[in-house]
Amino acid sequence: MGIKGLAKLLSDEAPDCIREVELKSLHGRKIAIDASMAIYQFLIAVRSGGPNQQATMLTNAEGETTSHIQGMFNRTIRYMTEGIRPVFVFDGKPPDVKSHELIKRREKREKAQAALAVASEEGNVEEQDKQSKRLVRAGTKENEDCRKLLTLMGVPVVTAPCEAEAQAAALCKAGLVYATGTEDMDALTFATPILVRKLTFANASKSMVQTMNYNKVIEGLAISHDQFVDLCIMLGCDYCDTIRGVGPKTALKLIREHGNIEKVIETIDRKKFVVPESWVPNEKKLDAQSDDDDEEGVESPSKEENNGIVDTEELIPAYVQARKLFNEHEVLNDIELKWKPCQAEDLQKFLVDDMGFNVDRVKNNIEKLQAAYKANSKPQTRMDSFFAVKANPNAAKSAAKRKADAAKAKAAVSKKKTKKH
């Protein structure tokens, strides 16, 4: 899911962090790509169908889905032909606190399944396409298929211990790659120096991609890294609920004024804005203990009566756990990235015999892959000045507004301190 509303907020409040560039401007760059995100997009985009027919995923003779293989094979060759060296990072085990988000996704798929049944019965092709895409999920088989494909292509594959975006960001911060390639905005929350979006959509007719610079995000929003993490949590992330009624602009205003979530909770109008119970678990526990004490004068068990054991885990606010995940995510540090020549014979066998691809097209694409590998293996000089960058028309206006808002927030804090004294 990423971070709700962050892309729009950055476009409005920190436009200098965003650049629209041509795919070829990334020539000579190594990019860590979120594999699960790419596979999901290929499953949605690579489909067959005609007029008045529901679009369906590509399959082989055995009925096995091959859309992800088709998309991954062609797009990886496109990257390498443009001089880009891709590294695909796969998700590991999701963090425990993400379970509530996974449950929500499952519920959404169940609703989509019911809506698809209705659309099919009514013969509504457009609605069938819409709901069938909502049912798409990159499962274990799709991930294993792509791991095998990429290995045969000679492209590095990394399996993260946890979230792929966090691992990709770590590779970027370590200088092993230039950027993280994903649509998920939480790559910025993990502090990837450069985020590249729209990579999966880039093709011959639409070659522009979007880059975001982390340092310019922080500079443009006029907040610190820790405040940015808290802002992202308030906007809405995969790891916890957020304050109901607080939109992106209000969240930024509150973080600028108060500095962190703890102080926001202390000062926010709780009648107007609903703070999740998981954010204030101590309040709920204290209320429960108070109610128990009020009933017939019965006191709650003391620490001594519980053999000195106090359940502190449930007292950790959800946003604190989310904050820790963003700042201390489990990643692999000892990684060596190697691009190798493709295993042409085994690759052709996998694509033609196992996946049912056209042999002539496969041979032609393998030749392109081999040529790209040979070209990319030579020392290369980047020529950034030759590539045009699309300027953001709102940059000057947003910069002035940002400075004014920051000044107001600073003045408000000073005023509150003066009143206290």
From Swiss-Prot:
It is found in: Nucleus, Nucleolus; Nucleus, Nucleoplasm; Mitochondrion. Residues 379-387 are annotated as: Interaction with PCNA. InterPro entries: 5-3_exonuclease_C_sf, Flap_endonuc, HhH2, PIN-like_dom_sf, XPG-I_dom, XPG/Rad2, XPG_CS, XPG_DNA_repair_N. It comes from the Eukaryota. Mg(2+) 1 binds at D34, D91, E163, E165. DNA binds at R47, R75, E163, G236, D238. Gene3D superfamilies: 5' to 3' exonuclease, C-terminal subdomain, 5'-nuclease. SMART domains: HhH2 (SM00279), XPGI (SM00484), XPGN (SM00485). Residues 127-258 are annotated as: I-domain. One of its GO terms (cellular component) is nucleolus. Structure-specific nuclease with 5'-flap endonuclease and 5'-3' exonuclease activities involved in DNA replication and repair. During DNA replication, cleaves the 5'-overhanging flap structure that is generated by displacement synthesis when DNA polymerase encounters the 5'-end of a downstream Okazaki fragment. It enters the flap from the 5'-end and then tracks to cleave the flap base, leaving a nick for ligation. Also involved in the long patch base excision repair (LP-BER) pathway, by cleaving within the apurinic/apyrimidinic (AP) site-terminated flap. This is Flap endonuclease 1. It comes from Phaeodactylum tricornutum (strain CCAP 1055/1).
